[in-house]
Amino acid sequence: MQGQTQSISFDGREIRLTTGRYAPQAGGSVMIECGDTSVLVTATRSSGREGIDFLPLICDYEERLYAAGRIPGSFMRREGRPPERATLISRLIDRPMRPLFPSWLRDDLQIVATCMSLDERVPADVLSVTGASMATLLAGIPFYGPMAAVRVGLLGDDFVLNPSYREIERGDLDLVVAGTPEGIVMVEAGANQLPEQDVIEAIDFGYEAVCELIKAQESILKDAGIEQVKPEQPEEDSTLPVYLEKACTKAIGEVLSQFDQSKADRDSKLDAIRSSTAETIEALKDSDPVRKLVSANSKALPTSFKALTKKLMRQQIVKDGKRVDGRSLDQVRPISAAAGVLPKRVHGSGLFQRGLTQVLSTATLGTPSDAQEMDDLNPSTEKTYLHHYNFPPYSVGETKPMRSPGRREIGHGALAERAILPVLPAKDTFPYVVRVVSEVLSSNGSTSMGSVCGSTLALMDAGVPLKAPVSGAAMGLIKEGDEVRILTDIQGIEDFLGDMDFKVAGTDKGITALQMDMKITGLAMGTIAEAINQARPARLHILEKMMEAIDTPRDGLSPHAPRLLSFRIDPELIGTVIGPGGRTIKGITERTNTKIDIEDSGIVTIASHDGAAADEAQKIIEGLTRKVNEGEVFSGAITRIIPIGAFVEILPGKEGMIHISQLSEARVEKVEDVVKVGDEVTVRVREIDNRGRINLTLRGVPQNGEEAEPAPAPTPVAPLN
């Protein structure tokens, strides 16, 4: 079980690929490691299924908490449903792998990446992507690889290859680049309003490292004596495609060139052409080869008809520079935007429409206790900004069961979330937890970028002080031989029949998020740079239209949003505020009808719909945490009486005791002879004992309205600026 290990060094970090040692019954397996992070990746192929017209590829990323030396917190103490992070990494593996399998392959393929050990300095996601390529090559699956991925960070003015978690948090860029020898196949990034040129340079920097990892995979194959299985296109029967080209080209071309029609009309006309063609084929003789082929395979006609439609649409774009809706290549669809479309019980709302794509986004403000706790391998323990994306079937005019969010919904929500994160206010100035939900009401391309635009409108309507508004656009690509055409603001059919979906989001200063997926085996750096630069005027045009609806965040919050009051206390006094078993803080919340959150750093956040109640809770906490000195004089009410003395609330929530001997200069037989519960008295702090108990006295202190020595002003509480 020795296996073979190939190592490659990046900026002092070594990546190791071990093959031939683990999972011997999998089609191919590799343990890919960097630092103490180890990911086992397997690729397995089983016989194909009859009658399908797609590649049944499944990519799964599995997290095991033992990788970080932890036991799951669930009742069963076992990992359950994959967390959102695992779903996103599964998509990260799938997106660069899928276009590298031949279009004719119909075998069941499964790639499983299992994180076996996690080093907090080394994220496991990009290792999983590279491992997926290596495992697929070892499995002998037809594949246009090798493919590899790296992460690029930006610290100051320097690019960092495969940065640690801390470097990612500190930096202005988190970019993942995947590529093949032919070019780049996938890009995903979050950025802190970086200029386009900086992002382009980062992608180029990352691709150089990708090429080194590709060479390492080729070396492993060579040393093991394994020859890569290159995809070979099987002979296809051209009978049906040739027939359709003669019978349908003119009719399809006429439909695609009718620019003033709606999507529904165009789809209806194309369906009518296909149905008419099916009837014509059905009327052919039984011995006719076209009828035989269509009768034997129900998918043959729809597949060939779609291929012809794709070919004609692409030709129209390349040769005539016209799209199916008549737009030029760099033209954005008509845009409308509105803020505050829902009643203010919804804290903020925005409606964004671009062409036939319509998204309604809502923003909800919550308290720190509403933060999402993360039970996964990510060092971050909670999320205070959440974006959830919903894609109901009616948005595309279909009927389907309504189920929980799938991978696509989770991925689109994460992209929109990432686009907004860099412009959110600092926690110190705006301590709210914010949840945005984007409801896709109508879909015809680029709903994720529509969600970004809708989010901006909703957040500004909710009064969230964004650093800058964010808009987004989706770019497309048609590549026919050496002819390349980049499309701005692609709609559904252009996404479906095109070669690229490149989403770019950002402010007027720069990019905050981007995501590129390909349907071809690689794209040159120059074309990617052109797409990024072409997206900027589109983004700014969209942003201008959004600003016509709302150009600055609202001055006030919704009357139904909670009011938060934040201040700092000495972290060593947190226990005093909480009290034994939480008794003190529970009493404060019940007395004032507020929610109170205290962080380990000493930041206290009080949430209430009543400002006066929040102020009262703050006074109580300040009283509890204020240092009391011997000799200070306070006025307060008698709260309770015991045989040996009486208790006085000298500050909100803080009591001291007057011993019976300190009630009067004369001897007192019974406490009630001098004071009763509710009496207002003026007391002096006689001493504070070694257990922190405050002992008070009435002796020598003026009473009954006589002027008393004022207490010193309380220590100022540091505001949260």
UniProtKB/Swiss-Prot annotation:
One GO cellular component term of this record is: cytosol
Listed GO molecular functions?
A: 3'-5'-RNA exonuclease activity; magnesium ion binding; polyribonucleotide nucleotidyltransferase activity; RNA binding
User: What are the entry keywords?
Assistant: Cytoplasm, Magnesium, Metal-binding, Nucleotidyltransferase, RNA-binding, Transferase
Tell me the Pfam families matching this sequence.
KH_1 (PF00013), PNPase (PF03726), RNase_PH (PF01138), RNase_PH_C (PF03725), S1 (PF00575)
Q: Where is this region: Disordered?
A: 700-721
- Cofactor(s) the protein needs: Mg(2+)
Give its localization. Answer: Cytoplasm
The top EC class is transferase
Q: Where is the S1 motif domain?
A: 631-699
Q: Where is the composition biased (Pro residues)?
A: 711-721
Swiss-Prot/TrEMBL catalytic activity: RNA(n+1) + phosphate = RNA(n) + a ribonucleoside 5'-diphosphate
Specify the superkingdom.
Answer: Bacteria
| Chain residues that bind Mg(2+) | D495, D501
Q: Which family does it belong to?
A: Belongs to the polyribonucleotide nucleotidyltransferase family.
What task does this protein carry out?
A: Involved in mRNA degradation. Catalyzes the phosphorolysis of single-stranded polyribonucleotides processively in the 3'- to 5'-direction.
- UniProt xrefs under NCBIfam families: polynuc_phos (TIGR03591), PRK11824.1 (NF008805)
State the PANTHER family in the record.
POLYRIBONUCLEOTIDE NUCLEOTIDYLTRANSFERASE, POLYRIBONUCLEOTIDE NUCLEOTIDYLTRANSFERASE 1, MITOCHONDRIAL
**UniProt-recorded name of the protein:** Polyribonucleotide nucleotidyltransferase
Native species? Synechococcus sp. (strain WH7803)
Q: Which gene encodes it?
A: pnp
